[in-house]
Amino acid sequence: MARTMTMRVSSLLVAVVLLAALSFQACSGHGGINDGDGQVDAPATPASSSGVRSKGLIAVKVWCLVILLVFTFAGGVSPYFYRWNESFLLLGTQFAAGVFLGTALMHFLADSTSTFKGLTTNQYPFSFMLTCVGFLLTMLSDLVIAAVARRSAAAGVSDNQVSEQQQRQQAEGAVMSRKEEEAAAVAHPAMLVRTSSFEDAVLLIVALCFHSVFEGIAIGVSASKSEAWRNLWTIGLHKIFAAVAMGIALLRMIPKRPFLMTVVYSLAFAVSSPVGVGIGIAIDATSQGRAADWTYAISMGLATGVFIYVAINHLIAKGYRPHHPTAADKPLFKFLAVLLGVAVMAVVMIWD
């Protein structure tokens, strides 16, 4: 018992130290828009555009890629070894939702709007339109995944019914031995459970990875080192909680808790955001001058929609659902956790 308590305390201390370090890094300095005169910062000139794609900035993005990979993977496999406190996961997920929401509206949308103002005199709300596009694309992906899940479930039920009919017909035509009947009765339900669990796990990973790729692109197209670190803090906070929740869900969906399958699924989820970072780096490296500014403005607009959808529909509305009653599972506590996340981003944006 004492050993278990020591492990819990040490794990919580590690989590607190990690979040504190990321918060300090996020507050150490930021790029972005200026005081609101409609002019774009460094990326507006060719000389500064070459600086944006400097080796130092790329190195920072690579570090962000590695950090996301390592900590997300560690969070995904951690439930196999350690039982997390459900109240901590519940409120932590809501806090991450507030950080996501604040980042989308106060950082991504502001940067996209400011950059568009410096690129064109057209008064059309490009950034807000792209936000709607990003939101709807993410919603469409969820609908497609849900449709595939329903179809797979329906196919499993129909196959089960057909199999039962065949068994009844065979029973009428021939007399099976008692051992064969028991084997047939036991084998099929077990296979159905394993199949449905496997399909649910795959769909869960696909949904999480799709969103994570677009989140990683936000880091890859960052215009400065400080902006890359800030995006890492925002996305990493969400990814760690999501990875832990995913690991817990996988262990519940896979009856025998195979360590190898947990590692494979966690690695797939961990790789998704670094893939997005790599895509963002490639986009940023291949675009120059005004093309780079257009790419950045469009990417930030789309990322705003993705972040808003994930924050509202995945984290706030669904979030982490504890499997045992907990005192923290109350609307007021959830609201305060989201409020704290938004407040943290509001304070961080003072130094933007």
Curated annotation (Swiss-Prot):
<feature type="transmembrane region" description="Helical">
    <location>
        <begin position="297"/>
        <end position="317"/>
    </location>
</feature>
<dbReference type="GO" id="GO:0016020">
    <property type="term" value="C:membrane"/>
</dbReference>
<dbReference type="GO" id="GO:0005886">
    <property type="term" value="C:plasma membrane"/>
</dbReference>
<feature type="transmembrane region" description="Helical">
    <location>
        <begin position="201"/>
        <end position="221"/>
    </location>
</feature>
<keyword id="KW-0732">Signal</keyword>
<keyword id="KW-0812">Transmembrane</keyword>
<dbReference type="InterPro" id="IPR003689">
    <property type="entry name" value="ZIP"/>
</dbReference>
<keyword id="KW-0813">Transport</keyword>
<feature type="topological domain" description="Extracellular">
    <location>
        <begin position="30"/>
        <end position="56"/>
    </location>
</feature>
<keyword id="KW-1003">Cell membrane</keyword>
<feature type="topological domain" description="Extracellular">
    <location>
        <begin position="222"/>
        <end position="230"/>
    </location>
</feature>
<feature type="topological domain" description="Cytoplasmic">
    <location>
        <begin position="252"/>
        <end position="262"/>
    </location>
</feature>
<feature type="transmembrane region" description="Helical">
    <location>
        <begin position="128"/>
        <end position="148"/>
    </location>
</feature>
<keyword id="KW-0862">Zinc</keyword>
<comment type="function">
    <text>Zinc transporter that may mediate zinc uptake from the rhizosphere. May also transport other divalent cations.</text>
</comment>
<feature type="topological domain" description="Extracellular">
    <location>
        <position position="352"/>
    </location>
</feature>
<feature type="topological domain" description="Extracellular">
    <location>
        <begin position="284"/>
        <end position="296"/>
    </location>
</feature>
<keyword id="KW-0472">Membrane</keyword>
<feature type="transmembrane region" description="Helical">
    <location>
        <begin position="88"/>
        <end position="108"/>
    </location>
</feature>
<keyword id="KW-0406">Ion transport</keyword>
<feature type="topological domain" description="Cytoplasmic">
    <location>
        <begin position="318"/>
        <end position="330"/>
    </location>
</feature>
<feature type="transmembrane region" description="Helical">
    <location>
        <begin position="263"/>
        <end position="283"/>
    </location>
</feature>
<dbReference type="GO" id="GO:0005385">
    <property type="term" value="F:zinc ion transmembrane transporter activity"/>
</dbReference>
<feature type="topological domain" description="Cytoplasmic">
    <location>
        <begin position="78"/>
        <end position="87"/>
    </location>
</feature>
<comment type="similarity">
    <text>Belongs to the ZIP transporter (TC 2.A.5) family.</text>
</comment>
<protein>
    <recommendedName>
        <fullName>Zinc transporter 1</fullName>
    </recommendedName>
</protein>
<dbReference type="Pfam" id="PF02535">
    <property type="entry name" value="Zip"/>
</dbReference>
<keyword id="KW-1133">Transmembrane helix</keyword>
<feature type="topological domain" description="Cytoplasmic">
    <location>
        <begin position="149"/>
        <end position="200"/>
    </location>
</feature>
<dbReference type="GO" id="GO:0006829">
    <property type="term" value="P:zinc ion transport"/>
</dbReference>
<feature type="transmembrane region" description="Helical">
    <location>
        <begin position="331"/>
        <end position="351"/>
    </location>
</feature>
<feature type="transmembrane region" description="Helical">
    <location>
        <begin position="231"/>
        <end position="251"/>
    </location>
</feature>
<dbReference type="GO" id="GO:0071577">
    <property type="term" value="P:zinc ion transmembrane transport"/>
</dbReference>
<feature type="topological domain" description="Extracellular">
    <location>
        <begin position="109"/>
        <end position="127"/>
    </location>
</feature>
<feature type="signal peptide">
    <location>
        <begin position="1"/>
        <end position="29"/>
    </location>
</feature>
<keyword id="KW-0864">Zinc transport</keyword>
<feature type="transmembrane region" description="Helical">
    <location>
        <begin position="57"/>
        <end position="77"/>
    </location>
</feature>
